Curated annotation (Swiss-Prot):
It comes from Methylorubrum extorquens (strain CM4 / NCIMB 13688) (Methylobacterium extorquens). Keywords: Antiviral defense, Endonuclease, Hydrolase, Magnesium, Metal-binding, Nuclease. This is CRISPR-associated endoribonuclease Cas2. GO terms for biological process: defense response to virus; maintenance of CRISPR repeat elements. Homodimer, forms a heterotetramer with a Cas1 homodimer. Its cofactor is Mg(2+). Coiled coil: none annotated.
Length: 95
């Protein structure tokens, strides 16, 4: 399966005008891992566009979503939220 990095800016989160709980529930349902406050890893058999379109339905039209596919040996990080190393070991990005 491909590993995707999903980043978002939830513009209306601070205003309290949108309920983002369904977004977080969907990420958890898919076994995604939160690496930073607004950054998740998810493993899926989809294209980058399909992943973005899927998660777009859980946010407002003015929220921002960025999806990119990780490739083996083509990423690096520091001070990620606990469990990131384990998640990547169990869901290694493809070459």
């Amino acid at each position: 399966m491909a590993v995707f990095l999903i980043a978002y800016d939830l513009v209306n989160e601070r205003r309290g005008t949108h309920d983002y709980q369904p977004l977080w529930d969907e990420l958890k349902r898919l076994g995604a891992h939160r690496t930073q406050f607004s950054l998740w890893l998810v493993s899926a058999n989809n294209t980058t566009a399909e992943v973005r379109q899927h998660f777009q339905q859980f946010v407002d039209s003015n929220d921002r979503i960025w999806v990119t596919r990780l490739r083996k040996s083509q990423y690096d990080y520091a001070n990620a939220i606990g469990g990131t190393n384990n998640w990547l070991s169990n869901n290694p990005p493809e070459a």
